[in-house]
């Protein structure tokens, strides 16, 4: 499909993500909760360096209701055996923010050019780049 071709040929990685995840992995458990189908996720992240920082990945096939429903994030909390108060969702979409809030999890939005016009007024935190995340976590 066009979408999979695009994913295979375009570099859509976030600059500096490996360094940020390496720093965070020293103190935090992390997972990816995505609305992508697992097949598309694997196209985006084949043998990707970010996966070894993650305890697990939840893809679209792993849950019944997609974001903005809270189910994906509630499932992640369950897998971590963690209460919402001990979690922070990092999002870049309005639907993801809505899902995090519906699951009663604090959410930090990382700005990107695709979601400039979205309503992120319910986010607890706003980050210009992912590189700001370690400092935010140290401050909270």
Where are these regions (language model features)?
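Glycine-centered short loops/turns at secondary-structure junctions
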Residues: 27-28, 104
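Short, flexible loop segments at the rims of nucleotide/cofactor-binding pockets, characterized by
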Residues: 7-11, 35, 104
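Metal-dependent phosphoesterase signature
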Residues: 1-22
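Asp-based, Mg2+/Mn2+-dependent phosphohydrolase catalytic module
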Residues: 22, 37-140
């Amino acid at each position: 499909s066009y979408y999979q071709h695009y994913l295979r040929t375009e570099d859509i990685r976030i600059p500096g993500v490996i360094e940020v995840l390496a720093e965070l992995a020293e103190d935090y458990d992390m997972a990816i909760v995505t609305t992508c189908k697992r097949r598309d996720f694997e196209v985006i992240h084949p043998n990707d360096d970010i996966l070894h920082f993650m305890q697990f990945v939840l893809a679209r096939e792993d849950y019944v209701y997609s974001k903005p429903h809270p189910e994906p994030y509630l499932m992640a909390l369950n897998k971590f055996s963690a209460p919402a108060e001990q979690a922070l969702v990092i999002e870049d979409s309005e639907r993801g923010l809505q899902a995090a809030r519906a699951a009663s999890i604090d959410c930090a939005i990382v700005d990107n050019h695709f979601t400039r016009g979205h309503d992120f007024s319910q986010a607890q935190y706003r980050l210009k780049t992912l590189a700001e995340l370690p400092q935010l976590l140290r401050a909270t």
